[in-house]
């Protein structure tokens, strides 16, 4: 059995954080959808790009509430210069009039939910995990080879990251994923995390993860292994039997 565990050090910095965990199997990453379903997913993404505008009340990206909240969170631990929460990159596309486009069914569904609810979402190939998955504070220098890089980029001491027994999986909380655990066309078992640092939005977080699970089941055949919200009172959960 594999577990997802949020370490004590994380809660000392973010006692009010909540992380929606969705573990799924039998995902058909390379599924070829019929025209009707492909159109439905495109419509979901188009609608999400439009609805995301409600989170953008300022032309200056850093002045918008969602982005400001995450930048404040990132100021509480060491980060690589320029590292930003993943939702900021999506919202920046919308702000600049270059909406997030279609890539692949699961990516499009995930991006649609991320934009609709303004929560960062990350997905990893769970079959590549070595032992349990953790979210916690790094000692610095742990193994990490980012997607698209030709050299390792280890985390800083004190940085928050997802990690397992072999090394870091995602740096700076939800900023950059590693090559080792990347979701590809052959991936069938996935760990998905959706993060919330605003206590008044926990209800929206539950709604978002429920909708994501339903969409992945409907369009790409995903079967839910576990779906749970992690918080300071429930710090771990099973993700693979």
PLM regions with names:
Residues 1-241:
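Charge-biased, low-complexity intrinsically disordered regions
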């Amino acid at each position: 059995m594999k577990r997802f565990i949020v370490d004590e050090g994380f809660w000392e910095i973010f006692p009010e954080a909540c992380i929606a965990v969705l573990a799924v199997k039998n995902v058909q990453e390379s599924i070829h959808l019929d025209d009707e379903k492909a159109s439905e997913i495109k419509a979901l993404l188009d609608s999400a790009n439009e609805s995301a505008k409600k989170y953008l009340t300022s032309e200056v990206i850093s002045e918008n509430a969602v982005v400001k909240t995450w930048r404040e969170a990132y100021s509480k631990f060491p980060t690589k210069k320029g590292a930003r929460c993943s939702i900021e990159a999506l919202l920046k596309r919308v702000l600049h009039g270059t909406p997030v486009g279609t890539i692949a069914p699961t990516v499009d569904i995930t991006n649609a939910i991320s934009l609709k609810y303004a929560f960062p979402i990350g997905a990893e190939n769970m079959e590549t995990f070595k032992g349990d998955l953790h979210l916690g504070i790094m000692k610095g220098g742990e193994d990490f080879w980012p997607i698209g890089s030709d050299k390792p980029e280890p985390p800083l001491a004190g940085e928050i990251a997802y990690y397992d027994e072999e090394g870091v999986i995602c740096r700076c909380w939800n900023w950059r994923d590693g090559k080792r655990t990347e979701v590809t066309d052959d991936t069938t078992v996935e760990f998905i995390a959706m993060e919330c640092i605003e206590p008044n939005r926990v209800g929206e977080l539950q709604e978002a993860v429920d909708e994501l699970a339903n969409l992945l089941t409907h369009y790409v055949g995903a079967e839910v292994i576990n779906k749970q919200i992690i918080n300071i009172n429930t710090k771990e959960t099973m993700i693979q039997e």
